[in-house]
Regions:
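Nucleotidyltransferase catalytic core that binds NTPs
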Residues: 1-144
Length: 144
């Protein structure tokens, strides 16, 4: 029986940290199922993605280490996903350490090391001054 791993994420502004954690998760078993947060679920969490769900889903699905992509539409779906996909290991980045321990009654729970110094938040923060400068230049141009 294949050992199935399940992980969740938004995967906005896809970067090497995303790839590495998905590769680490896949190395735990034979099959990796990835739940990508939908735009509507992100809105409920107070987050807005730069890249729309359909594109993020397709990017993740194109990776060699990923076997199946499903939508993440609620906090409550995790137990059903574990059951529906016959999951043996639930894996998340160590920034979520302890938050999913309650799933241990359904499968093994693992927290994986993240790639240091890279995150979508860091990328957004680094791009913000450029965005503001560009917006100011466009505004000046329009006002003439």
């Amino acid at each position: 029986m294949p050992r199935t791993i399940l992980t969740y994420g938004t995967f906005d502004l896809f970067h090497i940290g995303h790839l590495r954690i998905l590769e680490r998760a896949r190395a735990l078993g034979d099959r990796l199922v990835v739940a990508v947060s939908t735009d509507s679920f992100n809105a409920l969490k107070g987050k807005k993605s730069v890249i729309p769900f359909e594109h993020r889903r397709d990017i993740v699905a194109a990776l060699r280490c990923v076997d199946l992509v499903i939508p993440e539409e609620s906090w409550e779906q995790k137990v059903d996903d574990i059951r529906n996909h016959d999951v043996q290991v639930f894996a998340m980045g160590d920034d979520w350490e302890g938050r999913f321990d309650f799933l241990a009654e359904h499968c093994e729970v693992r927290y994986l090391a993240r790639t240091p110094e890279i995150s979508s938040t860091v990328i957004r923060t680094d791009l913000e001054p450029e965005r503001r400068d560009h917006l100011a230049a466009v505004t000046r141009e329009v006002k003439g």
